[in-house]
């Protein structure tokens, strides 16, 4: 359909892995595949309806041609055939109109489902982001100068250094005064 080769597909997957990460990439792939399946289904519905409409139009044209040839001069067998064609054309028209009415409602429902699905996935993805990722996303939306980018990188390095010594579950930092009595006890034991 889009004439995408293996190399382009591989490049898209690598970029997706870098941008989304290994945790969110499968969710994004499933979401995109759902969209593609929905779009394919809608396209096949439209294609089938167009084919039926073309058949109906051809039948109507053949009926008009038969009427132009003076319907009374035809043999009784041909007149029966023309009547049958008219009846089948009318049946197809009513069936097509019913399907069109049903398709319009289902098309609107499918559009609403897609919108709801995209909103829910975007909400779950934002809920899954850690505060540092949200800060990073917020800062990447703005255009940053090289100096600002370097400053942000330094802040991130400092945060990593601090998080090594002060884990998230640790409410109070360990002060040097708490460490000194232990070293004095060790020195007393040596003496």
Curated annotation (Swiss-Prot):
Bias (Polar residues) occurs at 119-138
What spans are recorded as compositionally biased (Basic and acidic residues)?
181-191
The biological processes this protein is annotated with in GO are: protein transport by the Tat complex
Keyword Disulfide bond part of the UniProt annotation? no
Coarsely, its chief localization is membrane
List localization entries: Cell inner membrane
A GO term, aspect molecular function: protein transmembrane transporter activity
The UniProt entry, under Gene3D superfamilies, shows: 1.20.5.3310
Gene Ontology CC terms, in alphabetical order = TAT protein transport complex
Segments spanning the bilayer are 1-21
Keywords of the record: Cell inner membrane, Cell membrane, Membrane, Protein transport, Translocation, Transmembrane, Transmembrane helix, Transport
DNA-binding recorded as keyword: no
Region Disordered, residue ranges:
119-139, 168-191
Membrane-protein topology: Single-pass membrane protein
Give the domain of life. Answer: Bacteria
UniProt lists the family membership as follows: Belongs to the TatB family.
Q: How does it assemble?
A: The Tat system comprises two distinct complexes: a TatABC complex, containing multiple copies of TatA, TatB and TatC subunits, and a separate TatA complex, containing only TatA subunits. Substrates initially bind to the TatABC complex, which probably triggers association of the separate TatA complex to form the active translocon.
Record function comment: Part of the twin-arginine translocation (Tat) system that transports large folded proteins containing a characteristic twin-arginine motif in their signal peptide across membranes. Together with TatC, TatB is part of a receptor directly interacting with Tat signal peptides. TatB may form an oligomeric binding site that transiently accommodates folded Tat precursor proteins before their translocation.
Tell me the protein's name: Sec-independent protein translocase protein TatB
Q: Which organism is it from?
A: Pasteurella multocida (strain Pm70)
């Amino acid at each position: 359909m889009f004439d995408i080769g293996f190399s382009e597909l591989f490049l898209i997957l690598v970029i997706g892995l870098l941008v989304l990460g290994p945790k969110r990439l499968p969710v994004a792939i499933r979401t995109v595949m759902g969209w593609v399946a929905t779009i394919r289904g809608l396209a096949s519905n439209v294609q089938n309806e167009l084919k039926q409409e073309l058949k109906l139009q051809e039948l109507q044209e053949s009926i008009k041609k038969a009427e132009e040839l003076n319907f009374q001069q035809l043999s009784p067998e041909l007149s029966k055939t023309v009547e049958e064609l008219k009846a089948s054309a009318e049946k197809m028209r009513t069936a097509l109109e019913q399907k069109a009415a049903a398709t319009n409602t289902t098309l609107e429902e499918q559009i609403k489902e897609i919108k709801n699905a995209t909103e829910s996935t975007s909400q779950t993805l934002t809920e899954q982001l850690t505060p540092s990722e949200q800060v990073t996303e917020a800062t990447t939306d703005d255009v940053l100068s090289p100096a600002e980018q370097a400053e942000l990188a330094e802040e991130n390095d400092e945060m990593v250094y601090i998080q090594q010594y002060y884990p998230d579950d640790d409410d109070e930092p360990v002060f040097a005064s708490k460490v000194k009595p232990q070293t004095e006890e060790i020195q007393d034991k040596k003496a």
